[in-house]
UniProtKB/Swiss-Prot annotation:
Substrate binds at H121. The modification N6-(pyridoxal phosphate)lysine is found at K234. Belongs to the group II decarboxylase family. Keywords: Decarboxylase, Lyase, Pyridoxal phosphate. Pathway: Siderophore biosynthesis; pseudomonine biosynthesis. Its cofactor is pyridoxal 5'-phosphate. It comes from Pseudomonas fluorescens. Gene3D superfamilies: Type I PLP-dependent aspartate aminotransferase-like (Major domain). This is Histidine decarboxylase.
Length: 405
């Protein structure tokens, strides 16, 4: 490949931009402290995990199925399902994983309705359109968790006997976890048997947090889920967006399609799949021991609590959900939100303490600006109130402005 001087200059400019902003991220859940230099040499190959997975190979030779199998073995254990009872693959990201879970639910219950909270990731709107699933948005509790009463009220009103439940294991804006045990208990109380509904878990961020904490909320197959997806570029960290999805093998069998010229069965959403991301996930998972993952997660959680404490000590109403690295606080000015690349929604903003925040310098800088702005706004409000009070206490003017000017 030969590039013109102008094109080389453009690339160099982008390189400098990336180097400058490599660790900028405080508002979005993407870990930046990764090093895949050992894998650079593989970029000269067209590695394509075509149709197959680590469970079944295709006849395309340059694949990374062996590594993908190791990755899926790791996640089967992480999410408490026997490898022989599980099926999964490395996806392009959380949206594909969620689509796969909803696809399985729809194939199991073609006339079922998908129920999800209003705090669910925006991709669910695309998914229901693409899969043409009936759907109902459910109210959320103040912390972002699904409103269980509203969920059951809607299921009852719809007379839905085969609900497909989209549970959040860490919502996008508030890091809230829907309690999948409570959901199952409420469905049982409503007379809906376990085999009559499907339960998918979107654990894009928290799927790599909960397994490593001392007191996790329910999140695994042992807790009753039918499928789960996790993003690879969030807590793990990757230069290429990716993720994984794990499901029960018996539910996946119904979507299998044999492709003779590839000599494989297709069960994935996409056909050709990135063969480099399984290598990256494999390298990342092999690079840290269980104890090291626990340390990374604890550091992130401790940093999140530090941010909450600093905000609250300065009178800012900040908070986080249990076992969440998402810190929610009142939305600051557009200037601050833009400067720190904050995600904002309505009156709230958040910061996310992913592992690349080795110290609190960026968090401190953000909090200092938010606090200073809040104090200035308070001062202005007091001054405006005082001036208004003075005006109201002045005696009414008894002269005509036109004649006395």
């Amino acid at each position: 490949m030969t590039l013109s001087p102008a094109d080389q200059s453009k690339l160099e400019g982008f390189w400098q931009h990336c180097v400058t902003h490599q660790y900028f991220n405080i508002g979005y859940p993407e870990s930046a402290d990764f090093d895949y230099s050992q894998l650079h040499r593989f970029l000269q190959f067209s590695i394509n995990n075509l149709l197959g997975t680590g469970n079944e190979y295709s006849n395309y030779l340059l694949n990374s199925f062996d590594f993908e199998k190791d990755v899926m073995t790791y996640f089967a254990e992480l999410f408490n399902i026997a490898l022989e009872d599980s099926w999964g693959y490395v996806t392009n990201g959380g949206t594909e994983g969620n689509m796969f879970g909803c696809y399985l639910g729809r194939e199991l219950f073609p006339d079922g309705t998908l129920y999800y909270s209003k705090d669910t990731h925006y991709s669910v709107a695309k998914i229901v359109k693409l899969l043409r699933i009936k759907c109902r948005a459910v109210e959320s509790l103040p912390n972002g968790e699904i409103d269980y009463d509203d969920l059951m009220a809607k299921i009852t009103a719809d007379q839905e006997r085969h609900p497909i439940i989209f549970a959040n294991i860490g919502t996008t804006m508030r890091g809230a976890l829907d309690n999948i045990v409570t959901i199952q208990q409420r469905l049982q109380q409503a007379g809906i048997a376990r085999h009559d509904y499907y339960l998918h878990a979107d654990a894009a961020l928290s799927g790599m947090i909960l397994p490593f904490v001392d007191h996790p909320q329910p999140f695994s197959f042992a807790d009753g889920i039918d499928s789960i997806c996790v993003s690879g570029h969030k807590m793990i960290g990757s230069p290429i967006p990716c993720g994984i999805v794990v499901a029960k093998r018996n539910n996946v069998a119904r979507i299998s399609v044999e492709v003779d010229y590839i000599r494989a069965h297709d069960k994935t959403i996409s056909g050709s799949r990135n063969g480099h991301t399984p290598l990256m996930m494999w390298a990342a998972l092999r690079s840290y021991s269980w104890a090291e993952w626990r340390h990374r997660i604890k550091h992130s959680l401790d940093t999140a609590q530090y941010a909450v404490d600093r905000f609250q000590a300065s009178g800012i109403d900040a908070w986080r959900n249990e076992n969440s690295i998402t810190v929610v606080f009142p939305c600051p000015s557009e200037r601050i939100a833009t400067k720190y690349c904050l995600a904002t929604s309505g009156n709230s903003a958040h910061l996310i303490t992913t592992p690349h925040h080795h110290d609190c310098s960026m968090i401190d800088a953000l909090i200092d600006e938010v606090v200073a702005e809040a104090q200035l706004n308070t001062l202005r409000s007091k001054r405006a109130f005082t001036e208004q009070t003075v005006v109201e206490r002045l005696p009414a003017a008894s002269f005509n402005l036109r004649t006395h000017y």
